[in-house]
């Protein structure tokens, strides 16, 4: 289910505060966050946000196309290494 429109988008208050400080000062420093559930708002465009994926921080440069999505969508948590194959598949 989608979030109710009357509630508005969720953005962690500390993340929002850090991004606003970057915008006001004109800096483009990387902001680290563990809040993967925070929604990307138009204020975030042009900022680089390092999103934690459980092991490390993945830098995400926010563009206009990302507005309305969640930060966690751009920081994959699983790495697919391929299915196990037969070792000597070609030999008979």
Curated annotation (Swiss-Prot):
<keyword id="KW-0689">Ribosomal protein</keyword>
<dbReference type="InterPro" id="IPR002222">
    <property type="entry name" value="Ribosomal_uS19"/>
</dbReference>
<feature type="region of interest" description="Disordered">
    <location>
        <begin position="72"/>
        <end position="92"/>
    </location>
</feature>
<dbReference type="GO" id="GO:0003735">
    <property type="term" value="F:structural constituent of ribosome"/>
</dbReference>
<dbReference type="InterPro" id="IPR005732">
    <property type="entry name" value="Ribosomal_uS19_bac-type"/>
</dbReference>
<comment type="function">
    <text>Protein S19 forms a complex with S13 that binds strongly to the 16S ribosomal RNA.</text>
</comment>
<dbReference type="Pfam" id="PF00203">
    <property type="entry name" value="Ribosomal_S19"/>
</dbReference>
<keyword id="KW-0694">RNA-binding</keyword>
<dbReference type="GO" id="GO:0005737">
    <property type="term" value="C:cytoplasm"/>
</dbReference>
<comment type="similarity">
    <text>Belongs to the universal ribosomal protein uS19 family.</text>
</comment>
<dbReference type="GO" id="GO:0006412">
    <property type="term" value="P:translation"/>
</dbReference>
<keyword id="KW-0699">rRNA-binding</keyword>
<dbReference type="InterPro" id="IPR023575">
    <property type="entry name" value="Ribosomal_uS19_SF"/>
</dbReference>
<dbReference type="GO" id="GO:0000028">
    <property type="term" value="P:ribosomal small subunit assembly"/>
</dbReference>
<feature type="compositionally biased region" description="Basic residues">
    <location>
        <begin position="80"/>
        <end position="92"/>
    </location>
</feature>
<dbReference type="GO" id="GO:0019843">
    <property type="term" value="F:rRNA binding"/>
</dbReference>
<dbReference type="InterPro" id="IPR020934">
    <property type="entry name" value="Ribosomal_uS19_CS"/>
</dbReference>
<keyword id="KW-0687">Ribonucleoprotein</keyword>
<protein>
    <recommendedName>
        <fullName>Small ribosomal subunit protein uS19</fullName>
    </recommendedName>
</protein>
<dbReference type="GO" id="GO:0015935">
    <property type="term" value="C:small ribosomal subunit"/>
</dbReference>
